[in-house]
Every structure is written in C-alpha cells, then in structure tokens.
Amino acid sequence: ERMQSIAYTYALMPALKKLYPDKEDLKDIIEKNKDELFSEIAQEINNDNVTDIEWDGYNLWITELGIGSYISGKELSDRYVENVSIKLANIMGVSFNRSRPILEANTEKLRISIWHESRCHKKSMSIRKIPEYLRFSHKDLVESDYAPESIINLLENSVTAHLSIVVGGQPHAGKTELVKYLSTKIPHNEKAGVYEDNQEIHYRKINPNKKCVEFFVDDKVTYQDIIKAGLRHNIDWILLSESRGPEVAHLLNSLSTGSYCMTTMHLDEVRDMPDRMYNMLGNSSVNERFINSVYKYIDLVVLVECDKHEKRRIKQIGFLSRCNSVNHCCVIYEDGTFTDETVPEDILDKFKRRGIKNIYEKVN
C-alpha cells in the first residue's frame, strides 16, 4: 500500500505543479526524495569523493577522485532502474519512451541523464555530482601537486588584478572547480553575475554575503540575452559555467565596456583558444576583427587536465595580449615547467595597477 501511495503521489506531481506553481520547484522535489530515488546507490551518492555514477545496463561504473573510473561490484536491478525512470519522468512532467528516449533532470547537487532501452538495448543512466562546496584550498592545491605554489599565487593574483580568465580542458578535467576556487578571490563589493543553464558554480553558497546575482538561462532567456542585460545591471564580473556558442560575441562586448569574466570551455591547447572561441560563433554575423577582440579582452588562459586516476593538474598557463596591432599568446608554463617566454608588459601593468609587484608571490 505504501508503494502504491508513493507511486500515486509521483504520478500526481505534474498536475500539482500546475495547480500550485508557488510550491516546491522540481529540483526541491527530487532532492527531498533523494533517499528513495537513489536507494540502491545511496553509498555512492553520499561519498564526496565520487564524482560520477554510471549504469550502462550491465555494469555500474564509478568515477572517484584519486582512483579513477572502475566497475563496482554492485549490480542494479532492472526494476530499480525502471522505477527511477518512471518517478523522474513524473516529477519532470515529461514522457519517456521510444519517441522521447532522453530523460534529463537536475538539482543543485546532481545532473541526471537516462536513455531509453528502445534505443540502447537496456536503460543507461548517468549521474554527475555537482558539489556545493570547494573541493580544495590553496594548501590542498600545492600539496596535491596541482601546480607549483608560484602558479597558484599567479592565478589568485590574476583575479585581484582583474584579468579576464578562461579555464580550458576536457570533460572531467575540473574546469568548473577551478573557477569556483578563483571566484573566492573576487572582492566582496564587486558584483558577480553568474549565468548558468545548470547550477554548477554555487557562487552564493561558496561566497556568502558577497555581491552577486545568479541567473538561470533557458530557451526563453538565453546567454546572449542575459549577458546583454547585464550591461544595465551593474555587473562587474561575468561568470559562465561554460562558453559553448554565439554568446561569446556578447561576452567580449561586455568585456569591452569594463567588465571582467571567468568561464570554461572545452580545449586541448592554450594557443588554440582564440580559434576555438571564433568557431563557437557558428553562422553568426560578426566582423573580421573578432579574433583581435579575443586577444584584447581575454587576458589569461589556463589548461587543466585529469589522468586516469582522476588526479588533476594545471598543464598550461598562457597570456593573451594585443599590442601595436599585433596579437600575442605567451605560454609561460607547460607540462610542469616554466618556459622562457615572458609575461607581456600590458598584462604586467594590470598587476602593477593593483599593487602587485611580484605576480608569483602570495598577496596578503
């Protein structure tokens, strides 16, 4: 009877949502029913070192910090996976069948994707955990060989110097985690505009009492819309969890008016970042000076990587600069060593204006 009652409640949720739109939102409903929804994977959900939980229909794959990706000895029952799918579909108020074979749901802590068995033999489920806290401190980064302390100091000082920063890398490399850490160095009275389609940065929770506004984008209000609107909302720092499309043109336009940014993007090489950003424009009509604007308004590019054991590190550090109508990309750190390239003078001037004489020494 209890299971029937629970199933009935789940079935009613879409209708209740329409009748009572001011009640708990869908994310809260999923979060509050987490223990029941994820009963067979509760141990993995509650383990802070686990970043991803994936069921391919045959094996349960776990990705864990310091260990990597491995097959768990646990096997999920078909009935359990079916029930999770039905309950999530009911909560979201969507169909999940051969015609609509992709089911996605998000909370503040979890990003869930399930594929229907009509398209992949058995149901496939992927859960990415989004921590609401910082995974590391300055000390943790140094002790874990994430990068030399001088590089960590450089990154922190770059925020103080108001450099616009792009963190690149492949999926699972820890791009957003680095942005979250660097966001703690933004002064409390400088307004951060955090624009996301799925909550990942958690700026307000990580930085309580700092000046900020968090805005969720969708098909109705896009990244382009909110970046443009931010110009009239006194935004000092634009934080994008990921740059992936034509919104980069509006981002650069905002930077040209005096804002600063932190964002992530998929990237293999620091030197490729300007071309990568240009390719994001798609068929958008922009003038041929776009690449020049990238070099002028993006200051620092960081490439992070992750090995098979989920050990993360900084692979490259590069500065972009445009002086005397010439574009420069100076990679000063690569594969664990400093190169013989020097930081551009116009970048050094930005540090000096904030009272930072040695960019590699910790301030305060």
Residue ranges and their predicted role:
Residues 1-96, 107:
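N-terminal accessory targeting/assembly segments
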Residues 16-35, 39-40, 309-364:
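NTP-binding/hydrolysis catalytic cores, primarily Walker-type P-loop NTPases
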Residues 47, 59-161:
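P-loop NTP-binding catalytic core
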Residues 165, 183-293:
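Switch/coupling sub-region of P-loop NTPases
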Residues 167-169:
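Hydrophobic anchor at the beta1->P-loop junction of P-loop NTPases
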Residues 172:
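Walker A (P-loop) phosphate-binding loop of P-loop NTPases
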Residues 175:
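Conserved lysine of the Walker
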Residues 178, 182:
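Hydrophobic positions on the alpha1 helix immediately C-terminal to the Walker A/P-loop
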